Structures are given as structure tokens and as C-alpha cells.
């Protein structure tokens, strides 16, 4: 049976979702979970785009040992050199290099001839092979490229030393039959195509990214590039979890398997959703809240008699827990530590003690802690960047039905250690809090989106707030978790501003939006 390699690009193409900017600790948390998930390759970022991305890729490459870590590079020596410096300490350094090949890109973006592009592609693959043991070459906009020219340039980069050739549907244009045909054509017409791995990379502009990826596998693709929850540029990318489960459930049809640990899918999906602030639609295949719900009376009757009447995927297969065991104020440190280990957290004794003390303090207000509560609490602490921006100290809100809401906020400037305290009013309590935060930070911040959800049912559930803001023409997303909605709202807003400041500090040179090469 064929083995399909999974190339995960959540940390590169997924992070290009508008309003998403992950800090190094958040990227590292996702990378470690992707390693547990069993991906074969993870694309950690675009090292040449900014010092922040470079440092994150370098840290991930040093940490991850059980899969190959790669970075994106344009077909220029500076990008390749930067990627090598970031990736050279990894277990299996790999480069993902790209250049556009379609006539529309050549004419309007690159302003080069086919001959010039072919020459540049070959020269840069050769240059990359002087450093990297594995080089993947991508033909940006392959699906709108003249097929004879595509076969020619693929032949030449293979001769130059490329180990993997990626044929991306960069704009999500093709139907599955058309995309599959490209793989057949390249296999039949590109010289030595059988000596390299062919890779698929699909965008979801017409809603066919997963179908196209599976069509590529049917027609000889050895590797599939995908993203957790299908997030990414514009309408997103092919969803890793959907492809992996489809290969497993329909192994009889695809005759292919992978190393993906399916029982880690739900945990990975939840982590990416929390850290990016991008909620998973309830009706999302495999990981949505409704994926295993049965509403129709006829369906319920059949399901109760025999699950397989209406359920082709069991919740347990993808790691959906049906037992929500909880911790409470009488739970001891041993039970707390055991629960953290079961949730996949590998923490030292000092960290366990720190989180246990926070947990015990909160149980005075909150009767029960579910898995979701603990995950939210720990992620909030572990992924916070404490070096740049503002630290939340306290919040007080005065509200009455016949009064104008007033908020008082105390923050600490993490650069100067100065404590800032301001007060302001608003039409509602949340607006009062946000007007006060603006005063504290003296920044013009426009709120674009505000969402609130609870971890679970019950009046003592944690509130999770996600916001998107605009600062100096740049979008930034933030999240906040607290038992109080207003506190969570303040933390989310502050988190979005801090992310913007981190991005502003680290972004010199290319913006991450320049990295749309595949």
C-alpha cells in the first residue's frame, strides 16, 4: 500500500490568514502538537520575511526531532541563505523554494520570459542543493501554466537536483479531474519524474481543495500539503484532518495510508483554533461540534439501534472525548499533574506547581474544571509574550441601568515598568473598557470583530473572547480567557495590541504576505 507524506503548512500558509499573527511560543506549541500528530514535514515559516519569523523557524527546527522542518524561500540567494541559517540545526533540514511559472505571473508580476524563469529556477535549485540535503521546488500557479512548459521546467529542476516537485493550485481554480490530469501529464512527460516525489498543494477558493488533493493522490501524488482546520490565504487551504480521515475511512478506494495519528486530530484542531482565534465552524467535517450530532428522529432511531447506520467516523477515532471528567477544589496535586499529562502537556515540576497554585486559587470561584478549562488556562500563560507591549494588572467597571458605564484600567508598560491607570466611559461596558485601554496606550485602534464563546455550559464557565483590530493599517487578532466576560474582553484587546507591537518590532523587510508562493 502506498504511503502518502503529509506536509503541514499551518505555521506558514495557515498563518497568512488575515488578522492571524502567532508569536514564537504559540508557533512552538503548535509545532510540538503537529509532531505528536505525526506529520512528515512541517513548514515553520518564511525565514527571510522578518527577524521574528527567522527566530521562530530556528527555534522550531532545534526543538522538533521526529519530522522534517522546512522553510519557504523565493528563488534568490538571500532567501536561501537565510533559510539555511534558520534550519541548519534541524534533524532533517529541508528547503521549499518557489518561482511562478504561469504566463500571467510572468507578464505582470515577474516581468520575465519563460527562458529567464527556467534559468533562474535551475540555478537556485543547484545553489540550494549545495546546502540542503532535501530541496522541494514549487511551480507557483502551476495549474494555469502551459503544460508543455511546466513539463520542461520540471524536467530541468529535477536534473538540477530537486527531490520533491510541488504542483500547487495557487488560486483554487481547477476541478478535481483537471488537477489529477496535471499529475498524470507530468508523470508521462517530465523527464525522470519517477525519480522524485510529486506534491499537491490546493487552495479552497472554489471549495474543492480537499477533493483536488485526493484527486492528486489518485493520480500519483506522493505528498499532500495541507493546513489544520483548512485556514489560510483567502478561502483557506486543503484541510489536513479531512484528507487524513478520508484516506483512512476509504482505504479500500485510495489504497494509501499515512503516519497521521488520527486520535490527535481533535486536540490539534482545538489548539490551532484557540491560538489563531479562528473558530471552527460547527458543521465542519471531522472536527466541527456537529460532526457527530444526530438531530433527525429517523437518524436518531437508526443510530441508537446500530451506530454505523449513520456514523462512518467514530468520535474516538479523531480524539473526541465522550467522558468529560472534571477537577474541583478538592482535587490534589497528583490528580492535577496526571490530568495535565493525559492532556499532552509535558511540564517541569516548577511549572506544574505554578499552574496548580493558579488552579487552586480559581476553584474558590469556579466549582469544576473541565479539560477545556485547563487547556485554555495553560495555553494563555505559556504562549504569552511578556517582553513587548503592556501587561494587564486590574480592571474595575461601574454599570447601572440609569448610569453611563465607566471603566478603570491599570496596565504596566513592559518596556519601562511604568504603571498606567486611566478611566473612560462608553455606551456599554465593553466599549467603556476599550475606550479606557485606548487612553492607556495612546493608540488609535479600530475594532473590526468581537466574538465571545464559553468553554462549556454552566454559569461558572470560562469566557473566551476573540477580537480583530486595525492599527496603523495593519490587522491584528487577539484572545482573552477569564471567568468574567469583561476581563476576558480587556485581555483579548490587549493581546491584539501586543501582537501588533511584536509584529511591528520583528517585521523588517518582507511582509509575511509576500510569501504566497504556493
UniProtKB/Swiss-Prot annotation:
UniProt GO MF annotations: 2-isopropylmalate synthase activity; acetyl-CoA C-acetyltransferase activity; manganese ion binding
A Pfam match: HCS_D2
Name of this protein: 2-isopropylmalate synthase
Reaction catalysis annotation: 3-methyl-2-oxobutanoate + acetyl-CoA + H2O = (2S)-2-isopropylmalate + CoA + H(+)
Principal location: cytoplasm
Gene Ontology BP annotations: L-leucine biosynthetic process
Subunit and interaction comment: Homodimer.
PROSITE patterns: AIPM_HOMOCIT_SYNTH_1, AIPM_HOMOCIT_SYNTH_2, PYR_CT
Residues in Pyruvate carboxyltransferase domain copies: 4-266
Pathways per UniProt: Amino-acid biosynthesis; L-leucine biosynthesis; L-leucine from 3-methyl-2-oxobutanoate: step 1/4
Membership in a protein family: Belongs to the alpha-IPM synthase/homocitrate synthase family. LeuA type 1 subfamily.
UniProtKB keywords: Amino-acid biosynthesis, Branched-chain amino acid biosynthesis, Cytoplasm, Leucine biosynthesis, Manganese, Metal-binding, Transferase
Gene of this entry: leuA
Cofactor(s) recorded in Swiss-Prot or TrEMBL: Mn(2+)
CC per GO annotation: cytoplasm
Residues at which Mn(2+) binds: 13, 201, 203, 237
Amino acid at each position: 500500500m502506498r504511503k502518502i507524506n503529509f506536509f503541514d503548512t499551518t505555521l506558514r500558509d495557515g498563518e497568512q490568514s488575515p488578522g492571524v499573527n502567532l508569536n514564537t511560543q504559540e508557533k512552538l506549541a503548535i509545532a510540538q502538537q503537529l509532531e505528536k500528530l505525526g506529520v512528515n514535514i512541517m513548514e515553520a515559516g518564511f525565514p527571510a520575511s522578518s527577524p521574528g519569523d527567522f527566530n521562530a523557524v530556528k527555534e522550531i527546527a532545534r526543538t522538533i526531532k521526529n519530522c522534517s522542518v522546512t522553510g519557504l524561500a523565493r528563488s534568490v540567494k538571500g532567501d536561501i541563505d537565510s533559510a539555511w541559517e534558520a534550519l541548519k540545526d534541524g534533524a532533517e533540514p529541508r528547503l521549499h523554494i518557489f518561482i511562478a511559472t504561469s504566463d500571467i505571473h510572468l507578464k505582470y508580476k515577474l516581468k520575465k520570459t519563460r527562458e529567464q524563469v527556467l534559468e533562474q529556477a535551475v540555478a537556485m535549485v543547484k545553489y540550494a542543493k549545495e546546502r540542503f540535503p532535501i530541496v522541494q521546488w514549487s511551480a507557483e500557479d502551476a495549474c494555469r501554466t502551459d503544460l508543455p512548459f511546466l513539463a520542461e521546467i520540471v524536467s530541468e529542476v529535477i536534473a538540477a537536483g530537486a527531490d520533491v516537485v510541488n504542483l500547487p493550485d495557487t488560486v483554487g481554480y481547477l476541478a478535481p479531474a483537471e488537477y489529477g490530469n496535471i499529475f498524470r501529464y507530468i508523470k508521462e512527460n517530465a523527464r525522470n519524474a519517477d525519480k522524485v516525489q510529486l506534491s499537491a498543494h490546493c487552495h479552497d477558493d472554489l471549495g474543492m481543495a480537499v477533493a483536488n488533493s485526493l484527486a492528486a493522490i489518485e493520480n500519483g501524488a506522493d505528498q499532500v500539503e495541507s493546513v489544520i482546520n483548512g485556514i489560510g490565504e483567502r478561502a483557506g487551504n486543503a484541510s489536513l484532518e479531512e484528507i487524513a480521515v478520508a484516506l483512512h475511512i476509504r482505504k479500500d478506494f485510495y489504497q494509501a495510508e499515512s503516519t497521521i495519528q488520527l486520535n490527535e486530530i481533535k486536540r490539534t484542531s482545538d489548539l490551532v483554533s484557540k491560538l489563531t482565534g479562528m473558530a471552527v465552524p460547527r458543521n465542519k467535517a471531522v472536527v466541527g461540534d456537529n460532526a457527530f450530532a444526530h438531530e433527525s428522529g429517523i437518524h436518531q432511531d437508526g443510530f441508537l439501534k446500530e451506530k454505523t447506520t449513520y456514523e462512518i467516523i467514530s468520535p474516538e477515532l479523531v480524539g473526541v472525548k465522550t467522558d468529560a471528567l472534571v477537577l474541583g477544589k478538592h482535587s490534589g496535586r497528583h490528580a492535577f499533574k496526571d490530568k495535565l499529562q493525559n492532556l499532552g502537556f509535558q511540564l517541569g515540576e516548577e511549572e506544574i506547581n505554578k499552574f496548580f497554585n493558579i488552579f487552586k486559587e480559581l476553584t474558590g470561584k469556579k466549582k469544576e474544571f473541565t479539560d477545556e478549562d485547563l487547556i485554555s488556562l495553560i495555553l494563555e500563560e505559556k504562549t504569552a509574550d511578556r517582553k513587548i507591549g503592556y501587561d494587564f494588572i486590574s480592571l474595575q467597571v461601574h454599570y447601572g441601568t440609569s448610569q453611563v458605564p465607566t471603566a478603570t484600567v491599570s496596565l504596566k508598560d513592559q518596556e519601562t515598568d511604568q504603571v498606567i491607570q486611566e478611566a473612560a466611559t462608553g455606551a456599554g461596558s465593553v466599549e467603556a473598557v476599550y475606550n479606557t485601554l485606548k487612553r492607556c496606550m495612546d493608540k488609535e485602534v479600530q475594532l473590526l470583530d468581537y466574538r465571545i464563546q464559553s468553554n462549556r455550559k454552566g454559569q461558572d464557565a470560562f469566557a473566551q473572547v476573540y477580537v480583530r483590530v486595525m492599527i496603523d493599517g495593519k490587522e491584528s487578532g487577539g484572545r482573552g480567557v477569564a471567568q468574567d466576560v469583561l476581563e476576558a474582553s480587556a485581555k483579548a484587546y490587549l493581546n491584539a495590541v501586543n501582537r501588533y507591537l511584536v509584529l511591528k518590532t520583528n517585521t523588517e523587510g518582507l511582509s509575511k504576505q509576500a510569501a504566497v508562493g504556493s
